[in-house]
């Protein structure tokens, strides 16, 4: 009978209704994903233009696989490579690729702390992310031990940043706020340290012995051509 029909009859919900609903939802999700992709692609062009005006190179990767390919194109085989706690590099598969390939990857976890630090300064390539980047190409990084920001500033011959589009901010003020109120509290959780931001999720401008906000580095220009390369990834990666 019509009353027991699984089809759409007089507003009843049946198997075909649920299937059609799922299809509509899937379509909306795909449309939303495409709009996000287009927005990120357009925004990335602005960021890359800003980077170029600051004597830095920028690239846009549609996904993690494209980001990995771009990164490997920038790293000659045989290179000595160091890293500054870059979760984003791991997320795109770059660390595994380097360990499996013809590269000399400096694993600081297997070295004396001081020896690992000094080896990183003399590396051919230094991998990092940014805690935030402005739409006109200025990068913000916060560091506790300061090994990461010091290698970004000088030492390694080339620095490659892997940056998710989730880290792009309108201006320097919002980039600083993101670094302090998003990246720092998450990293405090990651390192399991005793800071107010770990407990509350926001910055208290603390002077805790465990604070990871010891050094702030704003990278607004590169004096050395071809040293700084930024790969913008159309994905939510890193902190």
Model-inferred region functions:
Residues 121-239:
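Conserved phosphate- and dinucleotide-binding cores of soluble alpha/beta proteins
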Residues 15-31:
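Short, Lys/Arg-enriched N-terminal segments with co-localized hydrophobic residues
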Residues 27-53, 59, 79, 118, ...:
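SAM-dependent methyltransferases
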């Amino acid at each position: 009978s019509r009353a027991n029909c699984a089809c759409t009859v007089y507003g009843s919900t049946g198997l075909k209704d649920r299937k059609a609903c799922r299809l509509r939802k899937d379509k909306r999700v795909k449309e939303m994903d495409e709009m996000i992709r287009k927005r990120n692609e357009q925004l990335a062009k602005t960021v890359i233009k800003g980077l170029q005006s600051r004597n830095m190179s920028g690239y846009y990767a549609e996904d993690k696989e494209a980001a990995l390919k771009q990164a490997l194109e920038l790293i000659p085989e045989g290179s000595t490579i160091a890293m500054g706690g870059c979760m984003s590099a791991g997320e795109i598969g770059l660390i595994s690729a380097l360990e499996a390939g013809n590269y000399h990857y400096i694993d600081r976890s297997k070295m004396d702390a001081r020896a690992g630090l000094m080896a990183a300064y003399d590396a051919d390539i230094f991998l990092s992310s940014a805690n935030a980047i402005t739409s006109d190409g200025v990068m913000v990084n916060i560091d506790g031990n300061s090994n990461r920001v010091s290698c970004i500033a000088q030492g390694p011959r080339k620095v490659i940043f892997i940056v998710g589009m989730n880290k792009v901010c309108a201006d320097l003020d919002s980039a600083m706020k993101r670094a302090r109120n998003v990246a720092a509290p998450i990293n405090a959780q990651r390192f399991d340290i005793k800071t107010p931001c770990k407990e509350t999720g926001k910055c208290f401008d603390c002077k805790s012995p465990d604070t990871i906000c010891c050094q702030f580095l704003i990278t607004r220009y590169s004096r050395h051509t071809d040293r700084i390369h930024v790969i913008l990834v159309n994905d939510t990666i890193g902190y």
